[in-house]
């Protein structure tokens, strides 16, 4: 495969972490009116349900440093994808689970953990696999992913809300809004198994030959040697 195309594909896969950041943050906006009616929430509880994901974001972001060192940038992104998937599935509260607003909050916090980890590890991973001259432009893919995520979830929640009656939206429409995140979450999870580990992390783990092999897949041989030397010197 062409090295440039391979690099772009790796970047796009990583940027899905940003897309899910935007999607998970935005989906609650479309669902909040209907789930508030369903659970008969007062203003305080509604605010807690909407804002609870931020608690997970904080914890996820704080934990991401040690996590990314322990299992790598790629491993951390896989964890975030699993958390996004669990949150998307659980926030819709499947019929075999007890219908509780507290349970919804738990799943929203789990999604927030995914956001916090992805917000730190996705741009870090992109920066560490990118050639120095292209690093800045490629990292912006992550920011673009966030905006695209917001836009897609707006379209999805609008479509679901418009094609159901208000009673249907209150009963199950809001569940479908949350479940719609399962698609991109599982896609992110699957694709992550096909991207390489961060060469910088591999160096930190003493796996220098493996790191150089990754660099050669992304860069021309001379550039790979230069970047490898820079990592060794840093």
Feature roles, as predicted:
Residues 1-234:
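Transmembrane-helix signature of 12-pass secondary carriers
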């Amino acid at each position: 495969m062409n090295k440039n195309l391979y690099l772009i594909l790796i970047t796009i896969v990583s940027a899905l972490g940003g897309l899910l950041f935007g999607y998970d943050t935005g989906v609650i906006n479309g669902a909040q009116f209907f789930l508030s009616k369903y659970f008969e929430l007062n203003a305080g509880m509604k605010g807690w349900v909407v804002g609870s994901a931020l608690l997970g974001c904080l914890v996820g972001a704080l934990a991401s440093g040690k996590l990314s060192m322990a299992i790598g940038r790629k491993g951390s992104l896989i964890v975030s994808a699993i958390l996004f998937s669990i949150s998307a599935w659980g926030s819709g509260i499947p019929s075999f689970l007890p219908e509780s607003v507290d349970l919804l909050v738990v799943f929203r916090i789990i999604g927030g953990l995914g956001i916090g980890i992805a917000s730190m590890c996705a741009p870090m991973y992109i920066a560490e696999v990118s050639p120095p001259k292209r690093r800045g432009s490629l990292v912006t893919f992550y920011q673009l992913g966030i905006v695209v995520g917001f836009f897609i979830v707006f379209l999805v929640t609008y479509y679901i809300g418009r094609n159901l009656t208000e009673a249907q939206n209150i009963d199950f429409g809001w569940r479908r809004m949350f479940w719609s995140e399962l698609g991109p979450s599982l896609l992110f999870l699957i694709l992550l198994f096909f991207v390489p580990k961060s060469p910088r992390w591999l160096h930190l783990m003493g796996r220098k030959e493996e790191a150089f092999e990754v660099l050669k897949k992304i860069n021309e041989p001379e550039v790979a040697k230069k970047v490898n030397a820079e990592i060794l010197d840093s």
